[in-house]
Amino acid sequence: MDDVEMKVMEMKMISKMFQGILDACSAKCISKYNEGDLNVGESVCAERCVQKWMETFKKVQSKMSGTQPGQEVPQEAPAAAPEKKGWF
């Protein structure tokens, strides 16, 4: 699998996760779309729902990769960024 195919697959997974969060949390927290903005209760509910969804996702991901929940998956060390000079 080349780099482009991996990036496409990663974007599909992210999109699927986002859609799952959107479906689950909007169905749970938003009963009617009467206003342009969420009220306080809807906003708090949605925030908690997304937080729980992400915590669950991290736990499942750590189980699948074989790491402990607080442990980070080792990644490649980032290349040293070139020194920036001036405004840009």
From Swiss-Prot:
Keywords on record: Disulfide bond, Membrane, Metal-binding, Mitochondrion, Mitochondrion inner membrane, Protein transport, Translocation, Transport, Zinc
Motif (Twin CX3C motif): 25-49
GO biological processes: protein insertion into mitochondrial inner membrane
Pfam family, one: zf-Tim10_DDP
Chain spans, region Disordered: 63-88
Domain of life: Eukaryota
Transmembrane segments: none
MF annotations from Gene Ontology: metal ion binding
Biased composition (Low complexity): 68-81
Membrane topology: Peripheral membrane protein
Classification via InterPro entries: Tim10-like, Tim10-like_dom_sf
Predominant subcellular localization, coarse grouping: mitochondrion
Protein transport listed as a keyword: yes
Disulfide bonds, paired cysteine numbers: 25-49, 29-45
One Gene Ontology cellular component: mitochondrial intermembrane space protein transporter complex
Location within or outside the cell: Mitochondrion inner membrane
Similarity field: Belongs to the small Tim family.
Domain notes for this protein: The twin CX3C motif contains 4 conserved Cys residues that form 2 disulfide bonds in the mitochondrial intermembrane space. However, during the transit of timm9/timm10 from cytoplasm into mitochondrion, the Cys residues probably coordinate zinc, thereby preventing folding and allowing its transfer across mitochondrial outer membrane.
Function field: Component of the TIM22 complex, a complex that mediates the import and insertion of multi-pass transmembrane proteins into the mitochondrial inner membrane. The TIM22 complex forms a twin-pore translocase that uses the membrane potential as external driving force.
Assembly with partners or alone: Heterohexamer; composed of 3 copies of timm9 and 3 copies of timm10, named soluble 70 kDa complex. Associates directly with the TIM22 complex, whose core is composed of timm22. Interacts with the transmembrane regions of multi-pass transmembrane proteins in transit.
PANTHER family for the chain: MITOCHONDRIAL IMPORT INNER MEMBRANE TRANSLOCASE SUBUNIT TIM10 (PTHR11038:SF16)
Protein name: Mitochondrial import inner membrane translocase subunit Tim10
